Swiss-Prot record:
Residues 38-101 form a coiled coil. Belongs to the Mediator complex subunit 21 family. It is found in: Nucleus. Component of the Mediator complex. This is Putative mediator of RNA polymerase II transcription subunit 21. One of its GO terms (biological process) is regulation of transcription by RNA polymerase II.
């Protein structure tokens, strides 16, 4: 098998490895959670900070109106209890979600194995490329080599044509010889038959 074919086979193999890697990653990768409790807490803190900043800006813009308005009354006890119950329910739901989500029990090592396979295949491809003739030559040198190869090809083609002509002539001579021999043998048989009678 020539180097170009081997190189093509290895490139096809590398493409197959990449496709397999993507499939394995889609199939076996551990789940990633976008709505984890830490992100939710950070979002709540950011919202509270934004609300506080907005309130401070409003107070700075309208200090007289803020002084005239009495502070809001505290919420009734029933409303406070409802808010506490809602918070507890949310916390319980988050805990249940965390328990239901599968936790990776062992380290997932498929990416490192696939990366090694890609690296090994790439090294083989590089070695094939380095073995290609003319890889270290300039464009002019490669052009000269191609001209020489073309000249050699024409010479070989001419030699092939002349040997073909010679073979055709030899074949004609062999056919003529066979025909001559067969006619002579017939004539001898004919000559021998009258003698026998």
């Amino acid at each position: 098998m020539d180097l170009i074919t081997q190189l093509q086979d290895k490139l096809d193999h590398l493409l197959y490895v990449f496709g397999t890697c993507i499939g394995v990653l889609q199939r076996d990768a551990p789940p990633s959670f976008f709505n984890n409790p830490q992100n939710q807490q950070q979002q709540q803190q950011q919202q509270q900070q934004q609300q506080q900043q907005q309130q401070q800006q409003q107070q700075q813009q309208n200090p007289q109106t803020q002084q005239q308005l009495p502070p809001p009354p505290p919420p009734p006890p029933q409303q406070q209890q409802q808010q506490q119950q809602q918070q507890q329910q949310q916390q319980q739901q988050q805990q249940q979600q965390q328990q239901q989500q599968p936790q990776p029990t062992e380290e997932w090592d498929a990416p490192s194995k696939m990366a090694l396979q890609v690296i090994e295949t790439s090294k083989v491809i590089e070695s094939y490329i380095e073995k290609l003739p003319g890889f270290d030559k300039t464009e002019d040198q490669q052009y000269e080599d191609l001209k020489n190869l073309n000249t050699q090809s024409k010479q070989v083609s001419n030699e092939l044509l002349s040997s073909r002509r010679d073979a055709i002539e030899l074949l004609k001579m062999v056919k003529e010889s066979i025909l001559y021999i067969s006619e002579e043998s017939k004539n001898e048989e004919i000559d021998q038959q009258p003698m026998q009678q």
